[in-house]
Amino acid sequence: MKYLRLFIAIIAVTLFEGCVKDEHSSHDESTLVRTGQIAPDFSVELLDGREINLSDLRGRTVMLIFLSTTCTDCHAQFEDIARRCKEQSVPFEILAISRGESREATLEFANNYGLECDLGIDPDKSIYGMYATMYVPRVFLIDSEGYIKGLTVEYSPAEFDSLWQKALQLVR
């Protein structure tokens, strides 16, 4: 009995450790662009009907956010963003892109948070596919010259705050 408990404990620890390593490994493996690289350019249709290229934003710091309207982490992150935008003027561009979703679902999401940032739709995930293969929310911080200066995968308040602070430093 004593050996059975020990065996079960070892198996449990091994499985838990494997899950943790796999998660971070798959985050890395699913990220197609890295810090220090030029952000891939794209054209996206915004909810207001305009079309914008990422390269149109050169000269400005950009926080590029990929989201899904059904993702609970995305909702938590946008609650955080809405709060920050109410507390202070945001001196950098926020470009959010809903991947694989309809205009209607994305518009409802934007209205829930009173978002005033540019919000685009990527119904076939082709833009998202330039940056990653899975996991949202995913945030890329892009400097005024188009280089990726930081990124986060999924939502962690501490990691997002760190990236937000870095964005504020880039515009100073």
Where are these regions (language model features)?
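Thiol-/selenol-based redox modules, centered on thioredoxin-like
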Residues: 141-172
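Short, internal strand/loop/helix patches
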Residues: 95, 107-145
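Conserved helix-turn-beta segment immediately C-terminal to the redox Cys motif
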Residues: 60-61, 76-97, 111
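A short beta-strand-turn-helix
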Residues: 42-62
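Short pre-active-site segment immediately N-terminal to redox-active cysteine/selenocysteine motifs
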Residues: 60-62, 67-70, 135
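Conserved redox-active cysteine motifs that mediate thiol-disulfide chemistry
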Residues: 66-80
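N-terminal targeting signals for export/organelle localization
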Residues: 1-41, 161-165, 172
